Amino acid sequence: MASLIHGHAYPPIVEAVTEQLRRGSGFMLATECEVAYAEHLCSRSPSFEKVRFMNSGTEAVMVTIKASRAFTGRPKIAKVEGAYHGAYDYAEVSQITNPTVWGDADRPNGVPVAHGTPAAALNDVIILPFNNTQRALELLEEHAEELACVLLDPMPHRVGMNPIEPEFLTAMRNWTKTNGSLLVFDEVITYRSDYGGLQMALEVEPDLTAMGKMIGGGFPVGGVAGRADVMDLMNPKGDNYVFPYSGTFSANPISMTAGHI
């Protein structure tokens, strides 16, 4: 799933990481290798105005959802039925379910994956039928004033690796722009598809992108990149610091060094 795109023990990564280990593996402060890698990633995709690092794809998706809520002041998200987005309560709703609880094809049920998932989480996730543009738009309209974001995987592997239809994607982009919601891409897997992620081939720019796996050179990593006005919500030196976020090993120099190779 793209976590070892270079293969096992790729010599340049082994050499660079070994050298970095001699300097230090975790400082809990910004490092030169973090800054260099952030600048590199932002140069690869037009939608990446700023980037922030964490430790996994699950964490990255969680951050995009929380940032979307902080930016819009809205509680709900929308996602595609059957799409996998990691283990965060809201992201995993209707990820994998028994066919007996799917509900109507035109109005899929919000089904928990983990037993004990709070009902509130299910109520705040709107499930969209994949590539059914008309019905998806109708469902979005029902919750237009409450939706913080629409979360999409451009090629969801849990629904058969079927690519997203251009009509569906364009409709989601246009709807979010019109209604003040954010369009979020989960490119934890698909970022390997193009130099700047699958979004480059699709020619649609999301507001936020979640990344993981392949940007770490085989080491634990996650990343969120996107619009500066949204990313600035996490900037403690900014004027609109409403989403405090940090982590002990986030942007650690080992993952940054390996990822930048």
Features from the language model and the residues they span:
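Conserved N-terminal phosphate-binding loop of PLP-dependent enzymes in the Aspartate aminotransferase
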Residues: M1-I261
